């Protein structure tokens, strides 16, 4: 997605060979116009999947998930990382290791919001080692629902998360795929495009 790549190049900051900071538009301050475009792109890519629900994880996945849900006309449910006094029982639970925070979180979804007939699109801001997506898949599978696809805003293609998910037969659509963050420079994966005649 060209507009996203341009935003990453202009406002993203490479902190190391593994870490890209995009708090200027995605995971602290949110650019609503960009999020709207991201939502439209996810909806376009998954329009044939008959999605009934979008599942994400708090907090940075919520904005792109809501925008995609608006386009698809479905609801969003986000996995919580912290226990809530209002959500104590009847929860699906999974453990997820956070690459960025270097810690394991217990994530949960309420059983009353996801059902076995749901066709779920998982959306998240980043894909690195795949732990968040695998944890969300576990929650969906515990409900007996089906994962119709995974939408990722930014994939670190140099890490193995995308490979793990695709090897499981899951359709993964990433809007920006980063090949490298070496030497403080963002390099995107180059896809061959067929010549139109």
From Swiss-Prot:
Its main location: cytoplasm. Transmembrane segments: none annotated. Xanthine binds at residues 20, 27, 156. The keyword Cytoplasm applies. 5-phospho-alpha-D-ribose 1-diphosphate binds at residues 128-132. Pathway: Purine metabolism; XMP biosynthesis via salvage pathway; XMP from xanthine: step 1/1. One of its GO terms (biological process) is xanthine metabolic process. One of its GO terms (molecular function) is xanthine phosphoribosyltransferase activity. InterPro entries: PRibTrfase_dom, PRTase-like, Pur/Pyrimidine_PRTase, Xanthine_PRibTrfase. CDD domains: PRTases_typeI. It is found in: Cytoplasm. Its EC number is 2.4.2.22. Keywords: Cytoplasm, Glycosyltransferase, Purine salvage, Transferase. It comes from the Bacteria. It catalyses: XMP + diphosphate = xanthine + 5-phospho-alpha-D-ribose 1-diphosphate. Homodimer. Belongs to the purine/pyrimidine phosphoribosyltransferase family. Xpt subfamily. Converts the preformed base xanthine, a product of nucleic acid breakdown, to xanthosine 5'-monophosphate (XMP), so it can be reused for RNA or DNA synthesis. This is Xanthine phosphoribosyltransferase. It comes from Bacillus cytotoxicus (strain DSM 22905 / CIP 110041 / 391-98 / NVH 391-98).
């Amino acid at each position: 997605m060209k507009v996203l790549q341009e935003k990453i190049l202009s406002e993203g900051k490479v902190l190391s060979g593994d870490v890209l900071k995009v708090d200027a538009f995605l995971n602290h301050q949110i650019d609503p116009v960009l999020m709207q475009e991201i939502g439209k792109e996810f909806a376009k890519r998954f329009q044939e999947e008959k999605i009934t629900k979008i599942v994400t994880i708090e907090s940075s996945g919520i904005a792109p998930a809501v925008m995609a849900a608006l386009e698809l006309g479905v609801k969003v449910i986000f996995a919580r990382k912290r226990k809530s006094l209002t959500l104590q029982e009847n929860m699906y639970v999974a453990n997820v290791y956070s690459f960025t925070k270097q810690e394991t979180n217990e994530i949960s979804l309420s059983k009353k919001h996801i059902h076995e007939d749901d066709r779920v699109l998982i959306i998240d801001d980043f894909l690195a080692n795949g732990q968040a997506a695998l944890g969300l898949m576990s929650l969906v599978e515990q409900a007996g629902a089906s994962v119709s696809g995974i939408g990722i805003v930014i994939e670190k293609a140099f890490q193995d998360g995308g490979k793990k998910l695709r090897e499981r037969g899951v359709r993964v659509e990433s809007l920006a795929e980063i090949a490298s963050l070496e030497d403080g420079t963002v390099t995107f994966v180059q896809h061959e495009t067929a010549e139109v005649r």
